Amino acid sequence: MPPKRKASKNSVRGRKRRTRTNNLPLNPEVKEETVVSSTHRQTRSQSKKPSLSSSAEPPSESLDDNISALNSLQRSASSSEKGSDEDNEKLGSSEDDEFDDDFDTWEQVDLSPNKQEDKKDLHIVTQHITPQLTKESKKGSSSAMDKSIRLSIHIMHFTCLLYHGSVRNRWLMNSLLLDGLRDLLVEKQPSVVEAWVCSSQTHEDLLKLLNGLRMWWNKSFKIESHGLRKLGYRTLKQGFDIGFSPEIFHNFHEYQASLLSLKGSRDLAAQGFTALCRSLNLKARLIFSLQPLTFSTASYDDWSPHILPEETSTSIDDDLRYPIFWTEIYDQSEKKWIAVDAVVLNGVYTNDMTWFEPKGAYAESKHLRMGIVAAYDNDLYAKDVTLRYTDYQSSRLKKIRHVSFADKYFDFYKAIFGQLAKRNKDAEDIYEEKELESKVPIREPKSFADFKNHPEFVLIRHLRREEALLPNAKPVKTATFGNGKKATSEEVYLRKDVVICKTPENYHKEGRVIKEGEQPRKMVKARAVTISRKREHEFRVAETNEPVLQGLYSSDQTELYVPPPIKDGIIPKNGYGNMDCFVESMIPKGAAHLPYRGIAKIAKKLNIDYADAVTGFEFRKHRAIPVTTGIIVPEESAQMVYEEFLECEKIRIEKQQMKERKIIYGQWKHLLNALRIRKRIEEQYA
């Protein structure tokens, strides 16, 4: 008796069940309920996403659209029923075994509504959807998505404001603008300029000059427009009408015209005062107290009507009692920076800079917070000088600058300012950085995890493979972790006592060698990159049954490698017939490096001793391939080899050009012949 075959997927039992599922009666009430629930789900999902639209229209759903939605729901239910049928068929039954391939295809089920149901009235329930930019929820409840969105907005807004200040600072260095302001100052205040030029330019003379400029600029500049103002997060229901027109310049010419006319916003007035000081060859900075939207989901940074300018005010923006822009002047005699504000505070500040920090409930109501202060130099660089104007320990500053990243010691603002920082720093910059860093308190680690990557303290267990302690390093304290019998104590060292160590091979690539008699700072397991080195290590491990160790040395244990000078025009070579030339100092005295491709055959042709210059290695397929760049030849023969190389290159280029010219002529000849043939065919057979 032949064995019974398993029931196929197209069995009658499975097919009948599918048919019953797909032929559910299309009850209008059921359809109405289904559409409404799907609409509600869509509303909930859309309300979580920010929308760029200021108004929302109610969704208009046609009859066909809702029927299609219902059919899709039925098909999904059918597919889920199909999965359960397949599971039942795998179990097998005597009833299904009687049917095998009688039905090779499924019955086509019509999912469209039948005629009887079309005659019934279908009621479509719609609901007004109001998308929001920010979720209106109870205080203290915020999702991870809201926090992520606000953090992205904070980073983007901070970057845009920083770039805005950089553009304005670049405009303030325009020579036409500086000449115009200087001429205006000489015309209106000749005595102030003359007194400064004729003085010895001491600290008192500088203060006298700044006070004179401040008073004249404050009286002469007319505030006619609004400056920067942080409005906070708004919902779409609140709209996009901010209630006032801010000052906008489309190009530098509009900016220059407004500044020379002494009319504009208080931000423009503060920027113009910086340019005025620069026109007198003073080392002046443009200071910008950035006011980005915060990354916190708390309600204190949401929009409120109190943020807008007061309509009853007699002067524009006088409700903002603290400046956004001001000026710093470097005092050469005192070696320090002086802060000057000629618009809002209208004063000169030499020591106490906290006058610029917004304080009190009124400043909070206007969303004025000092968290990021940027200083733009004459040379178009920028740096963070926040610590000069505010207390790093204040809770207000921590709320603004404490951005959480995977690395809790990563300073996002420092990384961004690093892109605008000066590369070649002078003594003044170094002294200022040390002064500002001295105001940053060191956060004391309290747990085992706090010691990892801590900028001040370190545990021995947290040292990397290439890090080691100096021999004279001493523990500054002892940290205890755990409680009771599980408590352990470890010695804590200073991070400055940790040095970076390297192998002798790595130092050789830098042109340095280990000093005689130096002992390694650390012994670590040797690494093998190439196949030959791996085999060597495996052979040594098999012989000694111990891992291969390698010594690491710090930079103070090395000295510059000085190769022996060449003698009698003979270039010394290594075992591979070339010479290591990783840095310029590795070229021996009496030799010259000619880093030109193909120059080796010229030296060989002239019968001059040479060696290929190895300048690096490429690692491919577990093999170290040396990279050669030119040759090393005796110094007295270098000029002759170079001139012969130029002559050969000239001949080679001429031959290459002749070859290319011949190819081009051949292509033109082929094209002209084709055109002649085409013309003859058209004349004969057209």
UniProtKB/Swiss-Prot annotation:
**Coiled-coil region(s) at which residues?**
none
* A Gene Ontology cellular-component term: XPC complex
Which terms in the Gene Ontology molecular function aspect does this entry carry?
damaged DNA binding; single-stranded DNA binding
User: What is this protein identified as?
Assistant: DNA repair protein rhp42
Where does the UniProt entry say this protein principally localizes? nucleus
What is a biological process (GO) this protein takes part in?
Answer: nucleotide-excision repair
Question: What organism, scientifically named, is this protein from?
Answer: Schizosaccharomyces pombe (strain 972 / ATCC 24843)
**Residue ranges under compositional bias (Basic residues)?**
1-20
* Ranges where the record places region Disordered: 1-101
Q: Which top-level group of life is the source organism from? A: Eukaryota
In terms of InterPro entries, this protein maps to: BHD_2 (IPR018327), DNA_repair_Rad4 (IPR004583), DNA_repair_Rad4-like (IPR018026), Papain-like_cys_pep_sf (IPR038765), Rad4/PNGase_transGLS-fold (IPR018325), Rad4_beta-hairpin_dom1 (IPR018326), Rad4_beta-hairpin_dom3 (IPR018328), Rad4_BHD3_sf (IPR042488)
